[in-house]
Amino acid sequence: MSGIPHDHYEPKTGIEKWLHDRLPIVGLVYDTIMIPTPKNLNWWWIWGIVLAFTLVLQIVTGIVLAMHYTPHVDLAFASVEHIMRDVNGGWAMRYIHANGASLFFLAVYIHIFRGLYYGSYKAPREITWIVGMVIYLLMMGTAFMGYVLPWGQMSFWGATVITGLFGAIPGIGPSIQAWLLGGPAVDNATLNRFFSLHYLLPFVIAALVAIHIWAFHTTGNNNPTGVEVRRTSKADAEKDTLPFWPYFVIKDLFALALVLLGFFAVVAYMPNYLGHPDNYVQANPLSTPAHIVPEWYFLPFYAILRAFAADVWVVILVDGLTFGIVDAKFFGVIAMFGAIAVMALAPWLDTSKVRSGAYRPKFRMWFWFLVLDFVVLTWVGAMPTEYPYDWISLIASTYWFAYFLVILPLLGATEKPEPIPASIEEDFNSHYGNPAE
């Protein structure tokens, strides 16, 4: 499956042979869980199983919640309170689902930044990376629509602000916005549409996750060195790899148990810590909250959206050159989606021949600045648009684009990487010793 020489499934009994000839599902499962995996994978590689588990958790709890939820502006808020008070275990389902979204995004951000550090986007894994970024976009859309469903103050006004971004598109924007809303403003049609899509999209995400896994099983997994598994012979491949089962499955399950211990501690003891108190007030179109804040996992890109105000020189320049077509609001929308797009383009923006950041000293420095930059954007995204937060968000947004569009391409031409190991086996033995000795 991965092109790495290894033992494949061979049916032994007559029933196994009969089934394998007609539906080779046992062989598919065998080749999936026994796939040769680089033996030097570290703890940064445990977040894939966390993401897979959380996706299943979100789908299951979401289905249960949908059984008791009513997508109507007059009943939605009350139906959520009904779930909390009258449905057996309803409070647990809701808190697991709400905090599960936070765990999902925390895991995906770690997963993305791990990929950026170890060069998991480089050839031949570009398709894996692109599919992953599409999954991330669908996650954002699903989470946004789910946040609207409780029909609290922050739900309603968050929907008003975010759908208003589509209205900023010149010419066709207002029509797209009205089509999304189902009318001139956020109302019952909007709630019904968002509920339908929020129910549907997790299954689309699950299908893309299967493609994502298929893609990296085809190319083989990346690893901390960025060195490819030797494929010249089965003997060489076995020196670089271990079967996914039982070695990495057991490690991943242990890590998952630790993550879930922390997750359920949050669910049990501080389930509303990451929420907003305004969302416990029923939506009121006549009363605007003092400060509209999205969920924490949207804050970095929300900060970029707000960073490019009308008085920023580049916005003034673009506004003038386009004769007002690209105004500050539309520029912010472009910047927000552009910040995600530059991540998707990383395979072509990074010109270095060395895959892993572990052997790129200058890259490491700029990368950790990027991580700090992401944290700063998360912080200022929750702050009001006033001095000094507006300036901090502008500087942080500028660095985000500079890293991908300027620093990454230049590093490939100017950086002198450190020596990389000749094989995964060499790297493994340097850390843990040669098991043959």
From Swiss-Prot:
Heme b b562 binds at residues 97, 198. PROSITE patterns: CYTB_CTER (PS51003), CYTB_NTER (PS51002). It is a multi-pass membrane protein. Binds 2 heme b groups non-covalently. Component of the ubiquinol-cytochrome c reductase complex (complex III or cytochrome b-c1 complex), which is a respiratory chain that generates an electrochemical potential coupled to ATP synthesis. InterPro entries: Cyt_b/b6_C, Cyt_b/b6_C_sf, Cyt_b/b6_N, Cytb/b6-like_sf, Cytochrome_b, Cytochrome_b_C_euk/bac, Cytochrome_b_N_euk/bac, Di-haem_cyt_TM. The main subunits of complex b-c1 are: cytochrome b, cytochrome c1 and the Rieske protein. Pfam families: Cytochrom_B_C, Cytochrome_B. Heme b b566 binds at residues 111, 212. It comes from Rhodobacter capsulatus (strain ATCC BAA-309 / NBRC 16581 / SB1003). This is Cytochrome b. The keyword Transport applies. Its main location: membrane. The keyword Electron transport applies. Its cofactor is heme b.
